[in-house]
Structure formats: structure tokens, C-alpha cells
Swiss-Prot record:
Gene3D superfamilies: 3.30.230.10, 3.30.70.240, Elongation Factor G (Translational Gtpase), domain 3 (3.30.70.870), P-loop containing nucleotide triphosphate hydrolases (3.40.50.300), Translation factors (2.40.30.10). Catalyzes the GTP-dependent ribosomal translocation step during translation elongation. During this step, the ribosome changes from the pre-translocational (PRE) to the post-translocational (POST) state as the newly formed A-site-bound peptidyl-tRNA and P-site-bound deacylated tRNA move to the P and E sites, respectively. Catalyzes the coordinated movement of the two tRNA molecules, the mRNA and conformational changes in the ribosome. Signal peptide: none annotated. It is found in: Cytoplasm. Its EC number is 3.6.5.-. One of its GO terms (cellular component) is ribonucleoprotein complex. The modification Diphthamide is found at residue 699. This is Elongation factor 2. It catalyses: GTP + H2O = GDP + phosphate + H(+). PROSITE patterns: G_TR_1 (PS00301), G_TR_2 (PS51722).
């Protein structure tokens, strides 16, 4: 255990080469928090006895009750490496004390926005995978997010105790299952990795994969075993590491290494990994679990494990846990893997800077981030807000990328919409205190240099969820985070007692601060809407709202799904609309945008802020757009970045540029509330064909053009075979074979369609993947558990928007029923207005 003081930590923060910022990511219930415990215990914060049960990182009451992690929490660990290990580190280091900032993030898919916030401030990730279940859908999602942020992964294969005790596998089977898991992780890595990172695949023989059990507190890497044997046999450690994985065999008779499975007499040889690594572990397990009292002391002596007085009386699992913890302590293996293989901020920021910074790659701040320079101007990214014990106040949680942040320092607080040189979304305020985040506690410090993760007090009123802090007036923002999930499930919230309304409004503000991916807004009907990524996410948000943020009893409507409005074909005739004073006319047509273009816009590949020519080239080369059209995109909508476009196809129109702003504003308005039932439009492209304008500027102001453009857009939209789109989840369900039938029956009832079904090799488990409309997903988990006797566990991720085939304008069709219900709820007329209402005759 380390005697651990804040001053020690503060001095470590200055040697940035010895800092590691890393997050722990994994599928739900693969054991992140449990593994994190053994690390925290090593750094001397939990007492040794409680580790494995403390789940120190789950700071919230509901996390401990549900046994899942909801928010990502940060903690700093201190580790000293032996000199021989420090020699092997590929990057520069000073001395052998290391500071590891670790963020434990949730695995449940509804909270993947928390994961994004955690990834942004770290440089490396520990990916935890369950031996038995292997790589699941969420493992892939978070790993893809990490690689997208240029983060280097290392892998820990967890729950090996399950394979040994529950499934009783043989050594060769265990090796094969390890090797399959490593392979499937590497497939994901090679698919999504950025070339700049170089080869970031994981190799057990290079020590980037650990195997172990978080619950029992043991883990090992091949490097550790290679070190043991290298001393014993006097061989080179690196050679030994390569031999302990893959197809290499040791022939005990001839004392020679070979890569053939059989010896000269055709006898089967044992794989080196099984013989040297798994054998001692298997023998310990067998001796202890079969209560062979006489074998145990012999084995312990061979492996140099000393038990203290009362530990000798233990037996069964308790003894197993004690022995394995002493033989292969999890913290040592993981800390060694983290320190040896993950990059320091100095290394990482060199290749992450361009991706983090919005401005040009050659300006002073970008260069400072590349160097991770503590003496430059401050560049600090706040990735999320953490509620304090004090009701309604938040710590800003983030990372210093350049410069040094001090208590009492005056900084420019730039929100996500800030543009250099303008005054919008900008505050200049002083930071009250700088604190170290330590899981459940915070420790105040004076200042914090570049490359470290930090909490700030006193700026929570000025930032909504994330933003950039800087001392340089010309600095651009750090790039906004891309969330892999979108809020598609909404509820309306009202107070039971009308006097509590102000508290609700205040509570909603705090809620949207504390969760990076929740949307709160007030609908036109005066309802307060809360939107979340799924059922569980919403449930947690509303519980927070009622108990913490607002603190008043609430009435909550049944959940509603967000739809989108779209078109199928080009408008059947040109839509024309005249301005209220009859002096201006706009002619346009609407047509659909290809799905891949919409997806490229939504994922940020085609970006409204990109350079015009570069964007046009991408659209022409990859998506087959006409170059002149691609250059004449006026705007994206809604909110200036949605998947709808206005394209100017006019020829030689006078005064056209003067009305551009009005047209853009009208388009934002029209796409935010479509004509069918006031939902956002998606994949609609409006081509402006011709405009006739009045010669006097006074007769073509915003008041004339905006309503005209909106009416024209609606008319063109309704003339182009309108359809509605519903959100669809990708569901992954793991279950034993006997339960597969139950899954199919529930999915059929819920309009689900099965995409694939496969058995995981070496286990009795099946994985079923299916598409399930979000609309049908409420209560799905409960019904599934009933139908399968609680053996099936679904994971749902928003996957895509699916167009409903039926006609939304026909009130008897499926789509029509949805539209009518929504229009009633919004308080509109029940019948959708025809295109004639928005169309003007010449």
C-alpha cells in the first residue's frame, strides 16, 4: 500500500512523461468496476480487505443498488515500477514513479454518451472482455468510439475464474477461446483504427493483453511469466514472450523448442502457453477446489507463495482467492500493462492535437497542444459536469491540454457555439478552486499543468455540458464530441403541484448539465419534454430529476418516440409561393437525399463548417453529386447541421445574396417542424429553381421572404410523396439454446426482424441480433425475461431510421394512425393539410 499524499501527486503531475490518462471500457457486466477496484486498492485508497466488493467507483446509491455503473468517475493512482520494467518502456520517462488517471465508464449502452465524455480526456483505454461471452455489441461500439478519438487500446480478458469453475474447460480450449477473443478484438481495431496511430492491434506476446479475474483479484500478462522463466532458465525475456503464445511447443525429453504439435515419435506435445502459464494455475485450482490438503503446501512452496497464520486455515474458494491474489496480483499485471503500453500525454497529444482542435493545425495553440506545453496559453477541455454534494452546484470535469490552470485564474469560457472574434457563447470569469477528483472525494490543489485530468469549481453557471477554457483571445474551440447514440425516446414532465413549477424549470436546467446526452426543451404546447437514449437512460434521468435536481413530485407522461419526416421522390410539380405583399416569388422542388449522404452528415463526415471546395470534392467523388450543386449548398438544417440541404440552382437572379439569410432561417424553421406532424425533417433536399424579387430592398425584407420560403418548402415537401421514418434499435440478445424460441416469439409480436443468430464457439450461448422499432421497445426487456425464464439479456443501441412504407396522409394506414395520434397530442387539426394550402397560383 502506498502512503498517499496530495503533495506527492502534485509533484508527479509536473513530470508529464510519467502520467497515463486512461479509461476502462467494456460491455455491460463484463466487470470493469470490479477490476478497477483492485487497481484502486493498490494505490492505497480502499483497505485491502474490502476490494472486489467495494465497487469504489460506483459513487451513486442507485449504482450500488443496481450493480451497474451509470456515470463515469475519475480517480488518480500512484504506482512505482521496478527499474528493469522502466528500461523496456518505448517512450521517454523520468524516474520510476507513475501517476495514472483512471476513469471507470459505464458499459450499459444507454449511457454511452458518458463513455464518449470519458474518452475525450484520456489517451489510452483498457478494454475489458468477458472470457465466456466474448466480444459483444457494446464492446464493439465503445472500442469504435475510442479508435475514432485516436485512443490506444490494451485488453484485459476478465472472468477467467468462470471458465475454470463453471465451464470446467481444458487448457487447450481455454487457449483457443482466449485466442478467438484476441482475434475478434483485433478485427475491430484493424477496421476502425486511424493510420496515424500505427499498429494498435493487441498481441499477448507483446504484453498488451492481460488475463485474469477481477472478482478474485488476480491477473497476469505473458510478460510477467516470461520474466519468471527468463530468470529461471537464463533465456532472453523477449524471446520467451514470443514462445509463450501461439504455436510453439517445448519438448521436455529433448529440452528443445519446436513449432510442430508432435515430437519425433508422433506423441502430442503440450503448447508452451498451456504448459508454462496455464498449468500452474490449473493445478492450484484443482488442488484447492478438490480439497487436496497434502498437495497444496507443496504447490505453494514451488510457486513461492507464503500464507500467514490465519490464512492457512481457509479452504475452498476463500483459500483460492487468497492464494491467487498472492500468486498473480491483478493490480501488478494491469499497472505494468498500462504503464508499459499506453502513451503518456506528451506522446499522445502529438498525434491527437489536430483532431482535438478546431482551428488551423499551425496556430500557436495547436502547436502547444502537440507539445503538451505547460508554459503556453491555457487550453482546457471540459467534457462533463459532475454534481457536488452541494445541491445544484457542479464541478467541471476536464483535461488540461496546454498551459497550466490555477485557482483564481481569469479564463475565457467558450461554449460549443463560440466563434473566434465574436462575443456569443463566451464568458470571462475566474476559476474559484482547482480540485483533484478521487472517486468519492475531492482534494483541493493550487494549480495543474498540461496533460492532467482535473476538476474545477465555480464555472458551472457558465457552461451547459462541455466547452473550452483558454487564456488566449484568438484561440479556437476544442472539437465538440460526437455521440454514438441520439436521444430518441421522449416524455413530457409536469409537476403535481402548480406552485413547484419554478423548481421543475431549475431542475431541468441542472439535469441537462449533469448528463451529456439528455435533451430538455419546452414544446410549443407548453409541455416540458425530456428526451433520452433509451428506457433505462430516461428512467435514471427522471429519477435524478425528481430526487435531486428538482426535488418535487412529478407527473410523467408515457414515453413517446421521436419520428422524422422525409420524402420518397422528386416533387411532381414545381412548388411556387408568393410573399405576403405579392411582390416576391420562390420556385422550388424537394427531392430525397441518399441514405449514405444523410449518414455522412449525421456522423460529421460531411460537415457544414468544412471548406466549401473540399466538401464538394468529397460529395462528388464519394456520393456522385454534381460538383456545381455540391458547391452551392446554402445550408444544412435543422440547427445548421442536420441532414437536410438547400441547394441553389438558380441562374442569374438579381439581389439573390440579400435574401440568403432569410431563406436559410426559413429552412431551419421548416425542417425543425415538418408539415405532417411537426417533427424534424430528414434526408430532404430543396432545390431553389428560380426567385423573382422586388427591386426595392424594403419590399424584400425577412418578413416577406421567411414565411414565403417556409410555405414553398412545405408545398414542395408535400408534393414529393411524403413518408415518415421511425427510429430502429439494434438488439443483441445472449441466451442459452433453450431460450431462443422464446426470443423469436417476443420479437415477432413486436415487429422485430432477426438479422443473425450464431452460437459462440466453445460455449452453450447463442447470440441473436435483431432490428426492433424503438416504438415497440418499451417493456421489451420485461417481456423477454418472462418468455425465456430470465435467461436472455438484451442490449439495445439506436441503429438507423427506417421509412414506414404506408402513406402518412391516409388516416387508415399504420403511418396515418401514428400521425393522427401525434397531431392530437400536439393540439393540431387532425387532418394533415394538403399541398394546396401552401401553394400559390401565379
Amino acid at each position: 500500500m502506498v502512503a498517499f499524499t496530495v503533495d506527492q501527486m502534485r509533484s508527479l503531475m509536473d513530470t508529464v512523461t510519467n502520467v497515463r490518462n486512461m479509461s476502462v471500457i467494456a460491455h455491460v457486466d463484463h466487470g470493469k468496476s470490479t477490476l478497477t477496484d483492485s487497481l484502486v486498492q493498490k494505490a492505497g485508497i480502499i483497505s485491502a480487505a474490502k476490494a472486489g466488493e467495494a465497487r469504489f467507483m460506483d459513487t451513486r446509491k442507485d449504482e450500488q443498488e443496481r450493480g451497474i455503473t451509470i456515470k463515469s468517475t475519475a480517480i488518480s493512482l500512484y504506482s512505482e515500477m521496478p527499474d528493469e520494467d522502466v528500461k523496456d518502456i518505448a517512450q521517454n520517462t523520468e524516474g520510476n514513479a507513475f501517476l495514472i488517471n483512471l476513469i471507470d465508464s459505464p458499459g450499459h449502452v444507454d449511457f454511452s454518451s458518458e463513455v464518449t465524455a470519458a474518452l475525450r480526456v484520456t489517451d489510452g483505454a483498457l478494454v475489458v472482455v468477458d472470457t465466456v461471452e466474448g466480444v459483444c455489441v457494446q464492446t464493439e461500439t465503445v472500442l469504435r468510439q475510442a479508435l475514432g478519438e485516436r485512443i490506444k487500446p490494451v485488453v484485459c480478458i476478465n472472468k477467467v475464474d468462470r471458465a475454470l469453475l463453471e465451464l470446467q474447460v481444458s487448457k487447450e480450449d481455454l487457449y483457443q477461446s482466449f485466442s478467438r477473443t484476441v482475434e475478434s478484438v483485433n478485427v475491430i481495431i484493424s477496421t476502425y483504427a486511424d493510420e496515424i496511430l500505427g499498429d494498435v492491434q493487441v498481441y499477448p506476446s507483446k504484453g498488451t493483453v492481460a488475463f485474469g479475474s477481477g472478482l478474485h483479484g488476480w491477473a497476469f500478462t505473458i510478460r510477467q511469466f516470461a520474466q519468471r522463466y527468463a530468470k529461471k532458465f537464463g533465456v532472453d525475456k523477449v524471446k520467451m514472450m514470443e514462445r509463450l503464445w501461439g504455436d510453439s511447443y517445448f519438448n521436455p525429453k529433448t529440452k528443445k523448442w519446436t513449432n510442430k504439435e508432435t515430437d519425433a515419435d508422433g506423441k502430442q506435445l503440450e503448447r508452451a502457453f498451456n504448459m508454462f502459464v496455464l498449468d500452474p494455475i490449473f493445478r492450484l485450482f484443482a488442488a484447492i477446489m478438490n480439497f487436496k490438503k497434502d498437495e497444496i503446501p507443496v504447490l505453494l512452496e514451488k510457486l513461492e507463495i507464503n500464507l500467514k497464520g490465519d490464512e492457512k486455515d481457509q479452504e475452498g474458494k476463500a483459500l483460492l482467492k487468497t492464494v491467487m491474489k498472492k500468486f498473480l496480483p491483478a493490480a501488478d499485471a494491469l499497472l505494468e500493462m498500462i504503464v508499459m503500453n499506453l502513451p503518456s500525454p506528451v506522446t499522445a497529444q502529438a498525434y491527437r492535437a489536430e483532431q482535438l482542435y478546431e482551428g488551423p493545425a499551425d496556430d500557436a495553440n495547436c502547436m502547444a497542444i502537440k507539445r503538451c506545453d505547460p508554459k503556453a496559453d491555457l487550453m482546457l477541455y471540459v467534457s462533463k459536469m459532475v454534481p457536488t454534494s452541494d445541491k445544484g452546484r457542479f464541478y467541471a470535469f476536464g483535461r488540461v491540454f496546454a498551459g497550466t490552470v490555477r485557482s483564481g485564474q481569469k479564463v475565457r469560457i467558450q461554449g460549443p457555439n463560440y466563434v473566434p472574434g465574436k462575443k456569443d457563447d463566451l464568458f470571462v470569469k475566474a476559476i474559484q478552486r482547482v480540485v483533484l477528483m478521487m472517486g468519492r472525494f475531492v482534494e483541493p490543489i493550487d494549480d495543474c499543468p498540461a496533460g492532467n485530468i482535473i476538476g474545477l469549481v465555480g464555472i458551472d453557471q457558465f457552461l451547459l455540458k462541455s466547452g473550452t477554457l483558454t487564456t488566449d483571445e484568438t484561440a479556437h474551440n476544442m472539437k465538440v464530441m460526437k455521440f454514438s447514440v441520439s436521444p430518441v425516446v421522449q416524455v413530457a414532465v409536469e409537476v403535481k403541484n402548480a406552485n413547484d413549477l419554478p423548481k421543475l424549470v431549475e431542475g431541468l436546467k441542472r439535469l441537462s448539465k449533469s448528463d451529456p446526452c439528455v435533451l430538455t426543451y419546452m414544446a410549443e404546447t407548453g409541455e416540458h419534454i425530456v428526451a433520452g437514449t433509451g428506457e433505462l437512460h430516461l428512467e435514471i434521468c427522471l429519477q435524478d430529476l425528481e430526487n435531486d435536481h428538482a426535488g418535487v413530485p412529478l407527473k410523467i407522461s408515457p414515453p413517446v418516440v421521436a419520428y422524422r419526416e422525409t420524402v420518397e421522390t422528386e416533387s411532381s410539380q414545381t412548388a411556387l409561393s408568393k410573399s405576403p405583399n405579392k411582390h416576391n416569388r420562390i420556385y422550388l422542388k424537394a427531392e430525397p437525399i441518399e441514405e449514405e449522404v444523410s449518414l455522412a452528415i449525421e456522423s460529421g463526415k460531411i460537415n457544414p463548417r468544412d471548406d466549401l471546395k473540399a466538401r464538394a470534392r468529397v460529395m462528388a467523388d464519394e456520393f456522385g453529386w454534381d460538383v456545381t450543386d455540391a458547391r452551392k449548398i446554402w445550408c444544412f438544417g435543422p440547427d445548421g447541421n442536420g441532414p437536410n440541404l438547400v441547394v441553389d440552382q438558380t441562374k442569374a437572379v438579381q439581389y439573390l445574396n440579400e435574401i440568403k439569410d432569410s431563406v436559410v432561417a426559413a429552412f431551419q424553421w421548416a425542417t425543425k417542424e415538418g408539415p405532417i406532424f411537426g417533427e424534424q425533417m430528414r434526408s430532404v433536399r430543396v432545390n431553389i429553381l428560380d426567385v423573382t424579387l422586388h427591386a426595392d430592398a424594403i419590399h424584400r425584407g425577412g418578413g416577406q421572404i421567411i414565411p414565403t420560403m417556409r410555405r414553398a418548402t412545405y408545398a414542395g415537401f408535400l408534393l414529393a410523396e411524403p413518408k415518415i421514418q421511425e427510429p430502429v434499435f439494434l438488439v443483441e440478445i445472449q441466451c442459452p439454446e433453450s431460450a431462443v424460441g422464446g426470443i423469436y416469439s417476443v420479437l415477432n409480436k413486436k415487429r422485430g426482424q432477426v438479422v443473425s443468430e450464431e452460437q459462440r464457439p466453445g460455449t452453450p450461448l447463442f447470440t441473436v441480433k435483431a432490428y426492433l422499432p424503438v416504438n415497440e421497445s418499451f417493456g421489451f426487456t420485461g417481456e423477454l425475461r418472462q418468455a425465456t425464464g430470465g435467461q436472455a439479456f438484451p442490449q439495445m443501441v439506436f441503429d438507423h431510421w427506417a421509412t414506414l412504407g404506408s402513406d402518412p396522409l391516409d388516416p387508415t394506414s399504420k403511418a396515418g394512425e401514428i400521425v393522427t395520434a401525434a397531431r392530437k397530442r400536439h393540439g393540431m387539426k387532425e387532418v394533415v393539410p394538403g399541398w394546396q394550402e401552401y401553394y400559390d397560383k401565379l
